[in-house]
């Protein structure tokens, strides 16, 4: 029996070793600036919640008010630019969803960049559990903006420590873990970013159980398309490329899967 959380996309679930985001493991999305990393993590958090799972979303970059608007846009399938003028319709759709049985909880916590360590997150999870709030998935947006639990006085060593401790935390609390990191300039210019394009420290991609890069040419971006590339995996075949249709105005990272190669 797979020990995983659905992605919300049956085809993507089938491509994953545990038929979803595996518990006790870390998935790392990598992409250049503004490639949609936060949108991806938001979408998969919502999909898990709609499937009945509880999700903790820790934001170290985007304010909760903006995240709330993004989640409202995604859930109501409304363009971000039209949330205000269509607020009555949005509220109606959200109320209908809220009345649906079997929906999980999505807890969103905002902290300043550099203020939260894996040890702090561990204490937060312990406190949540003591109050009956038990997440199935923990999303960190994103790990590069955490601080090390113990300052090693070396940036590369601190990054390695953050990812090692975060991966251990996902294991300890039996949750599916998702985070993201930025590719370097070369990765942003490449048609397909690989593990070698990790910014700051390649050790982070060695620690992650699954590394998925977000890729799009200018032509693909104009068509609302992107490619997800399985750049590295501990438990399954790598090198898989998934071409997807997006609707980023509605915060839909994957509207549908176009093909898999």
Task: Label the predicted regions.
Residues 37:
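Conserved lysine of the Walker
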Residues 17-24:
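Phosphate-binding P-loop
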Residues 1-15:
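N-terminal pre-Walker A segment at the start of P-loop NTPase domains
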Residues 34:
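Walker A (P-loop) phosphate-binding loop of P-loop NTPases
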Residues 13-17, 50-134, 148, 241-244:
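Cytosolic-facing regulatory segments adjacent to core modules
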Residues 107-172, 234:
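Phosphate-binding/switch loop-helix module in NTP-utilizing enzymes
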Residues 40, 44:
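Hydrophobic positions on the alpha1 helix immediately C-terminal to the Walker A/P-loop
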Residues 78, 99-101, 118-138, 171-173, ...:
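C-terminal regions of RecA-like/P-loop NTPase motor modules
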């Amino acid at each position: 029996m797979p020990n995983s959380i659905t992605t919300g996309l049956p085809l993507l679930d089938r491509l994953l070793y545990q038929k979803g985001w595996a518990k006790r493991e870390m998935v790392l999305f990598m992409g250049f600036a503004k490639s949609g990393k936060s949108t991806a993590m938001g979408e998969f958090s919502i999909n898990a919640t709609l499937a009945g799972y509880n999700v903790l979303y820790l934001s170290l970059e985007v304010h909760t008010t903006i995240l709330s608007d993004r989640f409202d846009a995604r859930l109501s399938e409304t363009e971000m630019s039209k949330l205000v003028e269509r607020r009555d319709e949005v509220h109606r759709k959200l109320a209908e969803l809220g009345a649906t049985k079997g929906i999980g909880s999505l807890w969103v916590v905002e902290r300043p960049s550099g203020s939260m360590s894996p040890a702090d997150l561990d204490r937060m999870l312990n406190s949540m559990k003591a109050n009956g709030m038990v997440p199935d998935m923990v999303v960190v947006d994103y790990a590069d903006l955490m601080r090390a639990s113990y300052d090693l006085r070396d940036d590369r060593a601190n990054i390695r420590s953050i990812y090692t401790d975060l991966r251990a935390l996902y294991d300890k609390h039996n949750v599916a873990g998702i985070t993201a990191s930025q590719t370097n300039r070369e990765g942003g210019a490449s048609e397909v970013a690989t593990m070698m394009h990790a910014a700051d420290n390649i050790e982070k991609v060695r620690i992650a159980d699954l590394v998925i890069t977000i890729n799009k040419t200018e032509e693909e971006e104009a068509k609302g398309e992107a490619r997800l590339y399985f750049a590295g995996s501990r438990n399954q075949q790598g090198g898989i490329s998934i071409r997807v249709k997006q609707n980023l105005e509605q915060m839909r990272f994957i509207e549908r899967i176009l093909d898999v190669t």
